[in-house]
């Protein structure tokens, strides 16, 4: 029997209908389960400076002087004409649009001296002073990077990369912030520069640019407000620890019509790590991602691992994952603190290599030692992370080795999660460990596996969880810890239609009376 009927009436976009090539000029209104601001294309003063390339050597000076001059005049556009521009770190300034013409290529240096002096930044959730970013800004308003040009990072054979080999943010957290200076001098190493990473900025706009061969994370707004990222392309697969877009302790974000091909995570939410992140206490919140592509990479949409300040209110819809390891990836570790809540994902096509839904709160013994062991349940402290209110529905999954892989904490189970209206091809169905109120509804799979294993899962419910290959319902097997108030209901394998229900909408029973529910209803 075909699985096509399982998402009957709910249109899933194809890879040819999303991404930069489909970006319209206008910005469509944002409809989300939470309140979002109005997003409009920023308008800059009409003043323009056309940068002239130096005859020899680096072009850092003429580009930076043009940016500084334009900002002092009150703002405008700095145009980088076609050509290969060798440059060091560039610092964006208020009310300036750095526009890369088609055929323009900013090719960033791999030498430490071209990124000095050290600037304030955050590395893997820890504040410090180091090289910052290839394109950096601190405390600015109304900054933009636009155009059809390219931003190309340094090669991994460069001086910067070699001086980072022994560096870890774990080494700096015991120092006061003023002493966390890593500029490559006096035998100190450096922290890798991100590609585009404004910090403490308002009204950040990125459109149309291609990012290639990033040395580290690519687009990383930190402590920023009102961010619009549209129509960008990241090509960094096979080149370092290259996340695509990391929203780090920032809020009011719209990401649309993007394409990410990364070595690491693609669309990622972060907010600091451990005690350092708790001290800063700035969440990532109100993020909408739509009509975008994730190609290769560790995860399609990701929360973690650095979530000490919290991640809340994230909505992804009408996206395509084509080749990521995992589709929906939630990860942290016991001593990192923070939370993830109110995550909504719908209408996603995902062709993945490993898990479709992946949640890991234990981590690896390599990083946290015995804390990676599930038992004994630990005492709850401010550094105990928690996940709650995750809703994923109206999705089609192919190629995955495991449909669901949830390993939460016995002392802090993941709460109120919903996975429904799913059709999937998978080798294994998977497991859920340490969850409360975990619901799977109308999930139809093609698999030779027949069993979903659950452990310490209270108030779990499985409605219409069917295997088309075997022609029977998936068996729910309790292993290990007690699973109280388990609810399993089966439906016949017949074609049905579904109507998507957005969070906050009311369901009515057959007599027109409101009922409590979430996800979708059979019609």
Regions found by a protein language model. Name each.
Residues 4-79, 84-88, 93-97, 101-200, ...:
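Extracellular "leader-to-stem" segments immediately downstream of a signal peptide or signal-anchor
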Residues 102-103, 141-150, 202-212, 225-236, ...:
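Right-handed parallel beta-helix
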């Amino acid at each position: 029997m075909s699985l096509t009927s399982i998402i009957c009436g709910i249109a899933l976009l194809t890879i040819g209908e999303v991404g930069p090539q489909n970006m319209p000029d206008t910005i469509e209104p944002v409809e989300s389960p939470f309140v979002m601001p109005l997003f409009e294309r920023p308008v800059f003063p009409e003043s323009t400076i056309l940068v002239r390339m130096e005859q020899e050597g680096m072009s850092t000076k003429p580009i930076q002087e043009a940016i500084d001059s334009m900002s002092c005049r009150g703002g405008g556009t700095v145009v980088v004409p076609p050509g290969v521009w060798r440059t060091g770190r560039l610092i964006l300034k208020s009310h300036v649009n750095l526009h890369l013409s088609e055929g323009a290529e900013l090719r960033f240096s791999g030498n430490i001296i071209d990124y000095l002096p050290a600037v304030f930044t955050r590395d893997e959730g820890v504040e410090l002073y180091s090289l910052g970013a290839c394109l950096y800004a601190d405390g600015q308003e109304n900054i933009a990077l636009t155009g059809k040009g390219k931003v190309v990072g340094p090669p991994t054979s460069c001086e910067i990369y070699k001086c980072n080999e022994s560096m870890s943010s774990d080494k700096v957290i015991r120092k006061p912030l003023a002493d966390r200076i890593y500029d490559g001098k006096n035998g100190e190493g450096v922290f890798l520069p991100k590609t585009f990473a404004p910090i403490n900025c308002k009204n950040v706009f990125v459109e149309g640019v291609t990012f290639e061969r990033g040395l580290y994370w690519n687009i990383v707004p930190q402590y920023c407000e009102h961010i619009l990222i549209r129509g960008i392309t990241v090509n960094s697969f096979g080149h370092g620890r290259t996340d695509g877009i990391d929203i780090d302790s920032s809020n009011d974000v719209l990401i649309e019509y993007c394409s990410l091909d990364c070595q690491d995570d693609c669309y990622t939410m972060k907010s600091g790590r451990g005690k350092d992140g708790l001290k800063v206490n700035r969440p990532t919140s109100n993020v909408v991602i739509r009509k975008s592509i994730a190609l290769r990479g560790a995860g399609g949409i990701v929360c973690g691992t650095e979530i000490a300040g919290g991640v809340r209110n994230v909505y992804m819809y009408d996206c395509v994952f084509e080749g990521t390891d995992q589709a929906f990836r939630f990860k942290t570790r016991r001593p990192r603190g923070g939370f993830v809540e109110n995550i909504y994902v719908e209408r996603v096509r995902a062709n993945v290599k490993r898990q479709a839904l992946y949640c890991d709160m234990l981590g690896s013994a390599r990083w946290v030692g015995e804390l990676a062991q599930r038992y004994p349940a630990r005492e709850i402290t401010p550094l105990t992370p928690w996940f709650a209110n995750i809703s994923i529905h109206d999705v089609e999954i192919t190629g995955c080795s495991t449909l669901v892989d949830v390993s939460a904490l016995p002392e802090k189970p993941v709460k109120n999660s919903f996975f429904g209206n799913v059709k999937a091809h998978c080798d294994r169905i998977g497991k859920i460990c340490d969850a409360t109120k975990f619901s799977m509804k109308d999930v139809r799979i093609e698999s030779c596996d027949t069993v979903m294993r659950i452990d310490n899962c209270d108030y779990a419910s499985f409605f219409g969880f069917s295997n088309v290959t075997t022609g029977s319902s998936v068996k729910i097997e309790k292993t290990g810890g007690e699973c109280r108030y388990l609810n399993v209901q089966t439906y016949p394998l017949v074609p049905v239609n579904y109507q998507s229900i957005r969070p906050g909408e009311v369901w009515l029973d057959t007599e027109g009376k409101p009922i409590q529910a979430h996800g979708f209803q059979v019609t």
